[in-house]
Regions:
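N-terminal pro-sequences and low-complexity stem/linker regions of secreted or lumenal proteins
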Residues: 1-458
Length: 458
C-alpha cells in the first residue's frame, strides 16, 4: 500500500523478515504503488529466482465482467459498494474475525497473522456477534460448503465451542431452511475454503523451497466461486414461504475477507484501533491501519437496481448495521463504533419482482470443482494451515488418532490428509461428518491406511 520495502527485507520470507517490517512512516498516506515490488520480492524468496514480466504482471490484472457473469450480474441487478475496505492489511483469519467481533487483539500475537492457529483456538476470547445475538433472543447458524472444519469455529473457538454441535451445519441445510422459511435471524455462509477453493480464490502458492514450482494449493478456478454463488442466489431467490423467512424480508450480503494482494488504486482511510490500550501485535502492528478495498454486493428486492454506493464502509459496518436494526447494545470495539451502517441502501417503496431479476448463469467449471476425486482430495494451503491446530485440540479432547498423524517426519498423502480432516472435523462439528459406527469405521480405515503407508517395501 505504501511502496515501502526495507532493503534488508527485500527477498525475505515471513520467517526471516526483520523490524521495522516494511512499515510506513507514522501518519503516511498510502501511495498504492508497491504491489509489483512486493510481488517480485516474495516470488524471488519463494521460488529462488526473479519472475519474468509476464509473471509479475499478473498482480496488476483483473477479471472481465464476461469471465464472472454471476458476480457481475448481481452487481448490476442490485447494489454494489465501491468503497468497502477490509479491516486489516493482512490475511484471512484476522479479517474474518473483524466481520463478527470487530477485533482479533486478544491473541498473544495481536492476531496479525493466520499462524499459529493454536493461538486462535486457545486465546481469541473476544465477544462475537453470535454471542450477542443469542443473549438477546436472536437465532443464528453457520452453513458450510464442502468442508468439515468451519473457519468461523476455528477463529472464534473459545467463544463458540459449546455451539459447534448445534449451530454449524452443511450448506445443503441452508437450501432446505431457505425453501421452508425457517432460516435463523442471522446466517453466515462459508464457501469451500479447505478443499481447493470455491470462494473466487485462484490457486495460489508454491512449495516453499528454492527452485521448486509445485503448487501447494490444488488446482483451482474462480469459476467454482461462480458456481457456488449461483447456487446460493438461486436458493435466496426462491424463498417464497408465506410465513417465516422469505425473499422479501431477508437480505443476501456478499462480501470477501481480504483482497489477496492484487492491485488497487484507492487508498484506505484512517481507522481507530479496536482497543487503543492493547499492546502492539505481531510485527509491531497496532491495528491502526486499514486494509484496502474488497467487493461487496447487497441483494434485496428493496434495493434500487444498479445502485453504486460511494460511502466508506468496512467489515464492521455489518456489526454497526445489525446493532442499530436489532438493538444489540454497545459497540463491540472502537472499530465498529466508528463504522457506518448501510441501512440506507433499502430505498425502494415497493419491492422488485424476484421472477424478473436478470442474473446470468455461471460458466462451466473444470472437473476438479465438480468431483473432488479429480484433485486427489487435496486440501488448500488454508486447510493445511488450519488442520494441525485442530488435530492438537482433538487429541487433547480424546479423539484416538494414530500417532503418525502428529509425526513431523511422516509424509501424509493428500488423501490421508483429507481423511484426517473429515474425522477431526466430525469430532468437533458432528453435523459436518460421520458419526457413531461410521465414525469408528472411518477411524479403522485411517489406521490401516497409515499402517500400510509405513510398511517397508518388499
Amino acid at each position: 500500500l505504501f511502496g515501502t520495502l526495507d532493503e534488508h527485507n527485500r527477498f525475505a520470507g515471513p520467517e526471516t523478515m526483520a523490524p521495522p517490517w516494511n512499515a510506513p512512516a507514522e501518519g503516511a498516506t498510502p501511495t498504492m504503488d508497491g504491489f509489483v515490488a512486493d510481488y517480485i520480492s516474495f516470488f524471488t524468496w519463494e521460488k529462488g529466482r526473479q519472475p519474468t514480466y509476464d509473471e509479475y504482471a499478473q498482480i496488476m490484472q483483473c477479471y472481465t465482467p464476461e469471465q464472472v457473469p454471476v458476480l457481475n450480474g448481481l452487481a448490476r441487478e442490485f447494489g454494489v459498494f465501491d468503497h468497502w475496505f477490509c479491516e486489516v492489511p493482512s490475511q484471512t483469519f484476522m479479517n474474518r474475525s473483524f466481520w463478527t467481533a470487530a477485533t482479533c487483539t486478544p491473541l498473544p500475537t495481536g492476531g496479525t497473522a493466520n499462524s499459529p492457529v493454536s493461538h486462535w483456538i486457545k486465546d481469541n476470547t473476544a465477544e462475537t456477534l453470535f454471542n450477542r445475538l443469542e443473549s438477546l433472543g436472536k437465532t443464528w447458524k453457520v452453513y458450510v460448503k464442502d468442508g468439515q472444519i468451519p473457519l468461523t469455529g476455528v477463529i472464534h473457538w473459545p467463544r463458540l465451542r459449546d455451539r459447534f454441535a448445534t449451530h454449524f451445519v452443511p450448506f445443503e441445510e441452508f437450501e432446505d431452511d431457505a425453501a421452508a422459511g425457517t432460516l435463523p435471524d442471522f446466517s453466515l455462509i462459508e464457501p469451500n475454503l479447505l478443499l481447493g477453493h470455491g470462494d473466487y480464490h485462484p490457486a495460489a502458492g508454491a512449495a516453499l523451497a528454492p527452485g521448486v514450482d509445485l503448487q501447494v494449493d490444488p488446482p483451482s478456478s474462480i469459476l467454482s466461486g461462480e458456481m457456488f454463488l449461483e447456487r446460493l442466489f438461486t436458493a435466496y431467490r426462491n424463498m417464497r414461504s408465506p410465513e417465516g423467512a422469505n425473499v422479501w424480508n431477508t437480505t443476501l450480503f456478499i462480501g470477501w475477507d481480504e483482497p489477496g494482494g492484487t492491485y488497487d488504486h484507492v487508498p484506505p482511510g484512517p481507522v481507530p484501533a479496536p482497543d487503543a490500550a492493547a499492546p502492539a501485535g505481531q510485527f509491531d502492528f497496532r491495528f491502526d491501519r486499514s486494509g484496502y478495498r474488497v467487493p461487496a454486493i447487497v441483494v434485496s428486492p428493496w434495493v434500487e437496481p444498479g445502485s453504486v454506493y460511494n460511502q466508506e464502509h468496512r467489515h464492521t459496518s455489518m456489526l454497526a448495521t445489525l446493532r442499530d436494526k436489532w438493538g444489540l447494545g454497545e459497540p463491540f470495539t472502537q472499530r465498529d463504533a466508528a463504522a457506518k451502517p448501510f441501512d440506507y441502501v433499502f430505498s425502494r417503496q415497493t419491492p422488485t419482482d424476484p421472477d424478473a431479476w436478470d442474473v446470468p448463469a455461471a460458466l462451466p467449471a473444470p472437473p476438479y470443482h465438480v468431483e473432488w476425486e479429480s484433485s486427489d482430495k487435496s486440501l488448500s494451503t488454508l486447510g493445511k494451515a488450519a488442520l494441525p491446530g485442530v488435530i492438537a485440540a482433538a487429541k487433547a479432547k480424546g479423539l484416538p488418532l494414530p500417532p503418525e498423524v502428529e509425526d513431523p517426519n511422516f509424509h501424509l498423502t493428500t488423501e490421508l490428509f483429507y481423511d484426517i480432516q473429515v474425522l477431526v472435523g466430525a469430532h468437533f462439528w458432528p453435523k459436518m461428518g460421520p458419526q457413531g459406527a461410521d465414525m469408528v469405521a472411518r477411524l479403522e480405515d485411517l489406521k490401516k491406511a497409515l499402517h500400510d503407508a509405513t510398511k517397508p517395501e518388499a
